[in-house]
């Protein structure tokens, strides 16, 4: 969650959405061509962020496996100057994730990249690049993701109604509020020193689900953002139990108008030697080369039938006795994760401003 935490510090009052799996996959591609301290930094970061230690095998393969979900398309690619001759061993490892281009033809290269991203995301992300890349660009890494999964228990369209969404205590807007009643879902209410919050796990068909973290206080999301870590998230989710839930959840759609440039964030997290003078990609080619851009863009559409660009898991149990139903109203800023049934987070975002 380190990249996500860095981003939300920079985008305090904005919707944020990233795919950790996609970013990690792209870093793994770079690692195939890295040497020296660049390879050491990449390998260490990937090992720490990849499969949990107790699930790791003994091989040294650094590729990030994308777990099975309903339909998950990852768009990760490296674009490099056509004037550079790359090692055959590197090209063999990365296969279709590499393409040479003429960066002097900036507009054509921009359109080439955007068309590829559009194809890989089924048209949900139309343009990764809004402006041409500088003609002195030697290498660009792009990352885009598309996922679509049907809800295990779809929301009833005829129950959707217009309701209030509190951006803050003083700012209110309206949203289309979806309703799902009498479903047995994984739920827990957590009390921490920094505030209380609810966690609910909403399953999709297959092996994925969406986890919502909803603060009790309308303006309480900031405190959760400060304390969210992989360890805390696992600890909180370990307390989930099955409850009968009446769920009120807004329809929402998020598409970044501009891609995130993750270069400064990755540098802050210790990956200083992928960029600039000290980068060593000598396993890619014999020339000195460095990463100029690391772009990442995502899209999500949550409605009554499905979530597009996200995925996560749920456990369901039948209770035959009389049950008190918990009502969960998601009517103010919240955090959400989309994970598979191994616990790996495919997407993580916060929603604070209806578009």
From Swiss-Prot:
Q: Per the annotation, which location comes first and is thus the protein's main one?
A: host cell
Q: Does the keyword Methyltransferase apply?
A: no
Any one Gene Ontology MF annotation carried by this entry is:
serine-type endopeptidase inhibitor activity
Query: Entry's CDD domains?
Result: serpinN_SPI-1_SPI-2
Q: Family per UniProt?
A: Belongs to the serpin family. Poxviruses subfamily.
Q: What does this protein do?
A: This viral protein may be involved in the regulation of the complement cascade.
Which protein is depicted?
Serine proteinase inhibitor 1
Which species is this record about?
Cowpox virus (strain Brighton Red)
């Amino acid at each position: 969650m380190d990249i996500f935490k860095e981003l939300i510090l920079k985008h305090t009052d904005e919707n944020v959405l990233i795919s950790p799996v996609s970013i990690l996959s792209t870093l793994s591609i770079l690692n195939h061509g890295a040497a020296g301290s660049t390879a050491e930094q990449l390998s260490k970061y990937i090992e720490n962020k990849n499969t949990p230690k107790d699930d790791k095998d003994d091989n040294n393969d650094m590729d990030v496996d994308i777990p099975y979900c309903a339909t998950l398309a990852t768009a990760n690619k490296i674009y490099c100057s056509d004037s550079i001759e790359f090692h055959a061993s590197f090209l063999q490892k990365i296969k279709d994730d590499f393409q040479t281009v003429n960066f002097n033809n900036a507009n054509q290269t921009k359109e080439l990249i955007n068309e590829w991203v559009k194809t890989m995301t089924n048209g949900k992300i139309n343009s990764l690049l809004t402006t041409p890349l500088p003609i002195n660009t030697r290498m660009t890494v792009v990352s885009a993701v598309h996922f679509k999964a049907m809800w295990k228990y779809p929301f009833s369209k005829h129950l959707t109604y217009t309701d209030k969404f509190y951006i803050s205590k003083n700012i209110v807007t309206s949203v289309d509020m979806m309703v799902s009643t009498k479903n047995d879902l994984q739920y827990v209410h957590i009390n921490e020193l920094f505030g209380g919050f609810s966690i609910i796990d909403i399953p999709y068909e297959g092996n994925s689900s969406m986890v919502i973290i909803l603060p009790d206080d309308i303006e309480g999301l900031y405190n959760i953002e400060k304390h969210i870590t992989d360890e805390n998230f696992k600890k909180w989710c370990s307390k989930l139990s099955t409850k009968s839930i009446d769920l009120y959840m807004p329809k929402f759609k998020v598409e970044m108008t501009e891609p995130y440039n993750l270069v400064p964030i990755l540098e802050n997290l210790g990956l200083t030697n992928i960029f600039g003078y000290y980068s060593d990609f000598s396993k890619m080619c014999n020339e000195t080369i460095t990463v100029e851009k690391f772009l990442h863009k995502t899209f999500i559409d949550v409605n009554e039938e499905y979530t597009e660009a996200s995925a996560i898991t749920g456990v369901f149990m039948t209770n035959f006795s009389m049950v008190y139903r918990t009502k969960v109203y998601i009517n103010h800023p919240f955090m959400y994760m989309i994970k598979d049934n191994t616990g790996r987070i495919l997407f993580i975002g916060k929603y604070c401003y209806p578009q």
